[in-house]
Amino acid sequence: MYEIIQKLHSGWAYLAFLVLVIAVVNSFVGLFSKKDFTERDRKIALFALAGIHTQLLIGFVVYFVSPLGFSALGQMKDAALRLTSLEHPLMNIIGIVLITIGWMKHKKLTTSESKFKTFSIYYGLGLALILSKIPWGSWFD
């Protein structure tokens, strides 16, 4: 059971990462080209939000089922266990919170520039935090 959930978490990560990168690039392009914020731009950001939240939910299941997750919290001297039991989940949760804040803030804004700027900042920071603690070794096994 654990292996299936772990593979789902790893596989979905590629899709969630791709959509999030598209959303960040789209927001920077919109900001710097001074284009109007359209329904297409909103949907790109929404799909990134939904994809990354789905990844979070799958990650919670993995965290509590995995021998490398919650049960390994007492072994902070081991860098690999610390990454999977503390650093990866914590930084990803913070990154996803920033992405969620960006989504919530954009709804109150009225100008295209402010919406693109908000997505660029919050989604961009969220992406940076997520990228900082991905266990890259397991991505390319």
Give names to the regions the model predicted:
Residues 1-141:
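Membrane-embedded alpha-helical bundles that constitute the cytochrome b-like, heme-associated redox core
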